[in-house]
Every structure is written in C-alpha cells, then in structure tokens.
C-alpha cells in the first residue's frame, strides 16, 4: 500500500510537470494530501527523500530539482560540508562573550559553540569523528537532492591552527577519506586520490585568530589544501578587543590579512557589531574603515551581532546592568548600512550565528536576520552590490531574473589592498547587474613563500556560479559552469600578468579537487600551488 501511495504522488507530480503547471512547495504538499486521502494510510506526509526512493532513475532527473529542499545550500555551485573539531581549550583564554569550551554550562563542546547548532550536534552525534561527520553530511545532502560532486569543506570548532600538527593532518585526511570513499595511508595520498574522486574538495576553509596566522600557520594551512582562511577579527578597535579579552590586536589583523593575501589565500572576516564598548556609530565607522582602508579589505565577511549567552562573563555583566546588546532594529540598521557600502568584490557569507533562540538570553533572537535586513533595505531604497546579492543563482532565486546573453560583458576593477594590487575580473550581465563568474588576481606586496618571487602574479580565486532549478514549465539549467567563462577569465589574468605587470609566472591557489581543471589549462604543481610560466 505504501508503494502505491508513493507512486500516486510521483505520477501526479510528473503529470502536472508535463502539463506545465506550477509545482511549488505548497502544491507538492497538496498532492501528498490528495494521495493520502485515496490510500488512507495512517502516516503523515512522506518526506521528499522518501518519495525519491520509489522513483526510477529517469523520473529522478525531473523530480530531484522539483523536490530539492533548501536550494540555497548549493546555489553557488558547491555543496557546503561543515565538520566540527573535538572540544579543546582556546589558546589565549576566554573572551567575555564566548560560550562553550571544556567544562562549560553546555558540557564539553567546541569553543564558542553551545552544542545546539546543527554542525555541533552532528559533531557530538559522531563523537567529533571527521570521517563520520563528512559522510553523514554528504548523505544528508544527497537525500534531499543536492549534487555533491563539488564540496566546500569548512573546518569549525575553534582555532584549528592551534591544535597539534598531527591532529590537523589526521583530521583533514579523514575528511578526504570520507569524500574518496576509501582509506589512504597519508594526507598526501588522500589529496592525490581526491583530485579525481566522486566527491571532490574544491575549497577548504579553516577558521583561526589573527594572532594565530603567522608564516608558520599559513604554511601548514597551505599544506592541508586550504583555499580560504576565516579570521575572528570581531572588531578593529583595540580598546574594545581589550575590554572583551580577545587576546589579539588590530595590528595582528592587519598583518595576518597581508600575509594571507600575499600567500594567495582568500580572506574572510568574522565581525561582531554591538560588542561592549561599541555603539551604532562606532560600528558603522568600523564597516566603512574595513571596506575602504587598504590595510583591511577582506574578500568575504560574516556578521554576527553580539549575543548574551548563559555561562559567559558577558552574561554576568548583563545581569549587573553593565551591558545591553543591540535590539533587532538596531542590528538591522547597522548591518543594512554595512551592506549598502559593501564593494562589489566582497561577499556576505553569513548574517547571524546558527545559535538557537532558546539559548540566547538577550540580543537578536531571529535566525532569519539576513532576510529582515534585505526587507529593510528594500523598504529604504538601499541596495547591496556584494557578490552574494548579485550572483546568478541568488538573483534568480529571489527575483526570477536570468542573465541576458547579449549584455554579458567582461568587467574589471582594480584596487590597492594590503600593500599589493588587486584586480577583480568578472563576467556580468551589465544591464541586470548579475554576476556569472569572477577571478581575484593579485600582484603581491611582501610574499614569504619560496614559490612566489617578484615576477609572480597570484590568482587567489576563480569561481563560476552554477545551479540547477526546476522552472514552472521546463527543467532549465541555470548553470554557467561549462560555458568557458573560467577559461576566458584565466586567459585574461595571464594577459594582464604578462603584458601589464611584466610577470614571468602565474600561480593559482587551487582547491584539491580543481587541480585537474588547471592541468587542462597547461598548469602543473608548483609547491602548494598550480603554476604556469608566461
């Protein structure tokens, strides 16, 4: 009887699809109800992943994009897999706002987490085993119809470079083993296998503190295969950093930013408006400084308003009436301002932490703060031109607009940052302001890596957006990843490096699983990079 129910749902969806009817979430649920009334089985609405089990391979090609949950998960062309390291002490002590850690009110959980976040719960469930966490997340994404051939691996759980080198190597190796679906003898072997694996690690992100980002830590991160480093900057005011016991200075942030960029890595800042000692005006000034002062200018930002959580020093201050976090409308005002002045080469990767409202004592409890910011900006006539707001998948998802091929042009923006010259190359629909692909090219300032000399130009990032989505009538590919934009951007980067900067060599910081792509463009391994003589 259950099989008949599932076939009923599948056949009705396919029939309406062929008739060109709208198949949104509401209509899918109605179809489930209609079939349940026919077969009168005493179960609730079957999940989409359960329905897919009863579909043929041909049917799945149509059903998966229609039933796919949370399309934003792979809207940028890659599937994100976040893996949590085991709980360990923070290298510098504890910030006043930081929950979690060993012996916290939440038990032994990773530093700065509560144990209630999805990634932390997955970590706890698998005893922080990197292999099991990675496998479980990939399987979870596949069940709800997401492609998992391109994986962005994010290592969460505190200052990863502060852990023992042996732990770091083992942890990344086990994540790669899970993607490779086989055991390897060493990190190097796991990386080599992953270059052509079914689930390729196309990006690896590591979180650290500005004072744990010296040449030594950067060398280790590059050895692991890192392509992006997220810095816990929080504030650029030393008095606030000191008050909050951050244990690092703004000078550490400036130095770490320069070293990372000159090593070809992407730089993401974690920023926390509303910290003790700050104000709305100070936070607005901070964002303006970060986006205009060449000492900073990160490639990406995550914005988390300061929250009061039990078990922290900040909680005790709050109880004594010494601190009051931002109200929702204050946080929206500050973040909207930040987004309205954000340069087109910055990407907003997250607004608001993944902490459940139940553990937030005071502060912004809405998990959809980003949506509220978006609505506020629309109402005020403000516009954000960051990468995320302009990328092809997000524009289609939010506005239903696709790029017009006649208006797709190569666009270039040069700017000075961290002592060097940055060139942001992109293919854009200039009429509709839609971003299709981009490349970050850098003439470094003071590189320390032996592979990089004064005749070397760096490609810090190449990204072509891709996404599939079921449209009302047809399954259309909103995917730009196989139209040659990547090759054209690389060709232009090589031309600029040779003709305009007189360079003899170009190096690319390539994800492990993208090395084969660069080999096809004539690149070969040069230390931690893929390189080519010009």
Curated annotation (Swiss-Prot):
Cofactor binding comment, as recorded: Binds 1 [4Fe-4S] cluster. The cluster is coordinated with 3 cysteines and an exchangeable S-adenosyl-L-methionine.
InterPro entries: Acyl_CoA_acyltransferase (IPR016181), Aldolase_TIM (IPR013785), ELP3 (IPR039661), ELP3-like (IPR034687), ELP3-like_N (IPR056591), Elp3/MiaA/NifB-like_rSAM (IPR006638), GNAT_dom (IPR000182), Radical_SAM_C (IPR032432)
Cofactors demanded by this protein: [4Fe-4S] cluster
SUPFAM superfamilies named among the record's database cross-references: Acyl-CoA N-acyltransferases (Nat), Radical SAM enzymes
Protein role: tRNA uridine(34) acetyltransferase, which mediates formation of carboxymethyluridine in the wobble base at position 34 in tRNAs. The proposed mechanism is the following: (i) recruits S-adenosyl-L-methionine and cleaves it to generate a 5'-deoxyadenosine radical (5'-dA) in the radical S-adenosyl-L-methionine (rSAM) region, (ii) hydrolyzes acetyl-CoA in the N-acetyltransferase domain and (iii) an acetyl radical is formed by the products of the two domains and (iv) is transferred onto the C5 position of uridine(34) in the bound tRNA molecule.
Family: Belongs to the ELP3 family.
Stated name of the protein: tRNA uridine(34) acetyltransferase
Organism: Methanocaldococcus infernus (strain DSM 11812 / JCM 15783 / ME)
